[in-house]
Amino acid sequence: MAGKLYVVGVGPGHHDHMTFRAKQVIEESDTIVGYSTYVNLVEDLIDGKDVYKYDMTQEVERAQQCIKSATDGKIVSLVSRGDPGIYGMAGLIYETLAESGWNPKTGLQVEIIPGVSALNSCASLIGSPLMTDFAVVSMSDLLVPWEIIVKRVEAAAQGDYVIVIYNPSSKKRIHQLQDTRKILLKYRSLNTPVAIIKGAYRESESIVITDLEHMEEYADKLGMISTVIVGNSSTYNFNDLMINPRGYKSKYNLQAEQKIQN
């Protein structure tokens, strides 16, 4: 019997924001593989299945296990938080298969199940911060040299992109966001809006709307489940929301026909 490997994005962590297709393939699977925290997010969907839980740094072991199980004829779901194609497990799966000489037309079937990424879920909680061009940068230098990350931050800052920052800090990484702030201040004012979202759509969710001048005061809100969104030169704060205007105001009258009651 031919197996199949699904790489499944489960979104920010709450079932309400998991796609129907993601739930469907997890329920259809014989085997579930993933980082233990992410597997626990779908615990109620995996009763009676073979489950392989791994620590955070065991990405390669996760990839090898799910490929082995699928090659042995199992239907496997590799669980990834957010979207597996954005800093997720999709890349490692394809790299591992490519190294083994895999042929996507005749070999093991692989399907990526997209999910709601942190940039989507976090943006939805703070207004409309991503209405114009934006860049996404991860501060994690475990696999990418810090010098390259700095170059990318510099380019995004100089280009006046709204910047979404993944993995802004950890117990071992405390200087990265501080260095990033210094780079941003070369091109942006101190009152540039900044949002810090931790645990989006989870019970522990917290949201801070601040600016480049004061963002370091909220270091306790930073971590691996935090996302930072830095506005560009046109972004502004409005009643604790970040608005990144698309440009309609310069061409149209945006006043409502009737006064909105507060």
Q: What is the predicted role of each segment?
A:
Residues L5, Q158-N262:
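A contiguous loop/helix-start segment that scaffolds small-molecule binding in enzyme catalytic cores
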Residues M1-V110, Y218, E257-Q261:
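Class I S-adenosyl-L-methionine
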Residues F20, G88-G159:
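Class I SAM-dependent methyltransferase SAM-binding "motif I" and its flanking Rossmann-like core
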Residues K74-S80, S128-S138, A157-G159, E213-M224:
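A polyampholytic, Gly/Pro-enriched intrinsically disordered region
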